[in-house]
């Protein structure tokens, strides 16, 4: 068995050696099919390949040369473009047709405007007729327009405008410019009747000396007013609250801490607050207490800013002083009510002007003006 295998192996080796030294023979065929091929060593291999490519291109219409793809496009001619544009563009209307359309539209607008005006005039006429009918019906009822009651804008031709009231000795004013103080209730008590009012010339003379206007008293019929000429009495009324004098021992530290140093610290409360005699504001801060037994009501209550700016005093010192009297009891109060009772005009916010002239409070500034006025008089 082994000998047989050795023989077969030797035979295979011999056959391989014979094939290695076999001579290559070129074979040429006359067919032009795709299965025919030439040996690579033959001289006619390149020629047969070129012939094959040429024959393939002749038989196949889809054969393309190697290289980039080239596409041929056909552009339309200029004449065709113009023709297409003329077809796409709408036909232009003629001038005559355009004028006709404009004239028709104008005539339609004019007709609409005329119709609107006619309707408006008709509506106005109907509304006026209805209003006149309603007015005639209302006037037929008795007692509707009695007295001064009348419809607004409804005035007869015979009615005249109300005349202005004129007083004897007083020049009428048609210009809204007003240099003199208006006649108030408190001023009428001081000046008396309306016939005693000063004329414009006298008022102009007073305005020339406006520097001492704050300390000068108002004129009466016979001259300047005296202290005995004040019409309003300084007695307490029936509705005046009783005056309570608080001793110094009742003043607590909490009340002293509750004293306001400026107006921004004030808290307004109309039910629990107390009223300041100077500014008339009802706030919750601590006020002064007058120790004068003849004082009445809340006349001796002053807040911190008013007492400092108007009289140069402090609320704390006033509360701790058992003999402190309020400015009205001392006769130096410069509030608007007390000055009007004395026949003088109100000062307004005078603290800034007083500080501008070098004074610390309004009372010192008014006192200096009064001294200058008395020296000149």
Curated annotation (Swiss-Prot):
Phosphorylation at Thr-166 promotes interaction with YWHAE and YWHAZ, dissociation from MYC and sequestration in the cytoplasm. Disulfide bonds: none annotated. InterPro entries: CDCA7/CDA7L (IPR040221), Znf-4CXXC_R1 (IPR018866). Residues 148-173 are annotated as: Interaction with MYC. The keyword Ubl conjugation applies. The modification Phosphoserine is found at residues 193, 220. Residues 253-377 are annotated as: Mediates transcriptional activity. GO terms for biological process: apoptotic process; regulation of cell population proliferation; regulation of DNA-templated transcription. Residues 76-100 have a biased composition (Low complexity). Residues 58-113, 144-211 are annotated as: Disordered. Residues 199-210 have a biased composition (Acidic residues). A motif (Nuclear localization signal) lies at residues 163-179. Cdca7 expression is correlated with MYC expression in fibroblasts and is much higher in attached cells tham in non-attached cells. PANTHER family: CELL DIVISION CYCLE-ASSOCIATED PROTEIN 7, OS05G0300700 PROTEIN. This is Cell division cycle-associated protein 7.
């Amino acid at each position: 068995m082994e000998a047989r295998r050795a023989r077969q192996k030797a035979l295979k080796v011999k056959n391989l050696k014979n094939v290695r030294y076999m001579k290559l023979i070129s074979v040429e065929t006359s067919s032009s099919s795709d299965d025919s091929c030439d040996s690579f060593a033959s001289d006619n291999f390149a020629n047969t390949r070129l012939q094959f490519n040429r024959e393939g291109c002749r038989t196949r219409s889809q054969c393309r040369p190697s290289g980039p793809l080239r596409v041929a496009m056909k552009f339309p001619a200029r004449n065709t473009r113009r023709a297409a544009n003329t077809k796409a563009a709408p036909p232009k209307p003629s001038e005559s047709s355009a004028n006709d359309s404009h004239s028709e539209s104008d005539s339609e607008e004019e007709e609409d405007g005329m119709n609107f005006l006619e309707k408006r005039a008709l509506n106005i006429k109907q509304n006026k007729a209805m209003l006149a009918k309603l007015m005639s019906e209302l006037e037929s009822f008795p007692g509707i327009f009695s007295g001064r009651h009348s419809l607004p804008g409804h005035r007869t031709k015979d009615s005249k405008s109300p005349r202005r009231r004129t007083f004897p000795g007083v020049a009428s004013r048609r210009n809204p410019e007003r240099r003199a103080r208006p006649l108030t209730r408190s001023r009428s008590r001081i000046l008396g009747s309306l016939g005693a009012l000063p004329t414009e010339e006298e008022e102009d003379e007073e305005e020339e000396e406006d520097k001492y206007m704050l300390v000068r008293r108002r004129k009466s019929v016979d001259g300047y007013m005296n202290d005995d000429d004040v019409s309003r009495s300084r007695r307490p009324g029936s509705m005046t609250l009783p005056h309570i004098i608080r001793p110094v021992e009742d003043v607590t530290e909490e009340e002293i801490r509750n004293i306001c140093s400026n107006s921004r610290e004030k808290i307004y409360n109309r039910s629990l607050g107390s009223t300041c005699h100077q500014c008339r504001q009802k706030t919750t801060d601590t006020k002064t207490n007058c120790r004068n037994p003849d004082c009445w009501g809340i006349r001796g209550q002053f807040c911190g800013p008013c007492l400092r700016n108007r009289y140069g005093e402090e609320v704390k010192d006033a509360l701790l002083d058992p003999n402190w009297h309020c400015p009205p009891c001392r006769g130096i109060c410069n509030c608007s009510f007390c000055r009007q009772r004395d026949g003088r005009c109100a000062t307004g916010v005078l603290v800034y002007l007083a500080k501008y002239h070098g004074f610390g409070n309004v009372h010192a500034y008014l006192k200096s003006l009064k001294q200058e006025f008395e020296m000149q008089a």
